[in-house]
Amino acid sequence: MKPTILLYDSGMGGLTIYDAIRENLPDAHYLYCFDNAYFPYSEKSEAVLIELAVGIVQKIAENYPLDMVVVACNTASTVVLPALRERFAMPIVGTVPAIKPAAQISQTKTIGLLATKGTVTRPYVDELIERYAKDCVVERIGSTDLVEIVEEKQQTGSVDMRRLQKVVEEWQSHPTLDTVILGCTHFPLVKEELQQLLPRVSFFVDPGNGIANRVVSLLQDVKRNVNNENKENQAFCTQNSENFLKREKVMQNWGFKRLNILNFVEK
């Protein structure tokens, strides 16, 4: 039987995680929800992020028996995982910055963490750096603008390079930075553009493959809820908007039949 896997993010950046999982589990039944009503998550309070996460998973679980939930958002994952695991029985997989592998591959022991403002300031990230990158210098850039740049690229196919350059300009002349962690699920979608702007950087690291391996491992022990052999992949957003049709086209290009509006209201 096909497992049903829900992925959610504030936007469409979590599709990079979906893509990595789908490569390993091409026949699974996928649900993807982006919370555009509260996009971006980067500067939302922890209480709001938890409330949104629980509400979204609860609403979708009412209509779809879920075998797994993947929080395809670094910002949310640094906050909401304990609350989701306490509330729901299915496995919950989070997305956190790939600090451990970055520290292992950096030759100069100088790493850049490129993430949202919310992620770079979380104590959880400090703990990861202390645990896995104690011998490294970790520079941080927190950017909400970069998330919006990626969302625009997904809908238009183009990137404003001058706007992108402003995000990373402080790293362009850095003498020893050789590894950059793409600490937001949106950011792998502009990896090529970042490589152009940061030619001295040898490694760009994102957690997609690691998360996919974790999902595959956990599903081996999961008892499947129902037979989903003929179920179509479905996408959800939490608010209608003027660019709804563009977003629906993006989701269809990623293999989702249609984009539905989830009637979700923050409690």
Curated annotation (Swiss-Prot):
Reactions this protein catalyses: L-glutamate = D-glutamate
Entry annotation: catalytic residues: 73 (proton donor/acceptor), 184 (proton donor/acceptor)
GO biological process terms on file: cell wall organization; peptidoglycan biosynthetic process; regulation of cell shape
Record key words, sorted: Cell shape, Cell wall biogenesis/degradation, Isomerase, Peptidoglycan synthesis
Pfam families per record: Asp_Glu_race (PF01177)
PROSITE patterns: ASP_GLU_RACEMASE_1, ASP_GLU_RACEMASE_2
Function: Provides the (R)-glutamate required for cell wall biosynthesis.
Protein name: Glutamate racemase
Organism the protein comes from: Glaesserella parasuis serovar 5 (strain SH0165)
Taxonomic classification: Bacteria, Pseudomonadati, Pseudomonadota, Gammaproteobacteria, Pasteurellales
Gene: murI
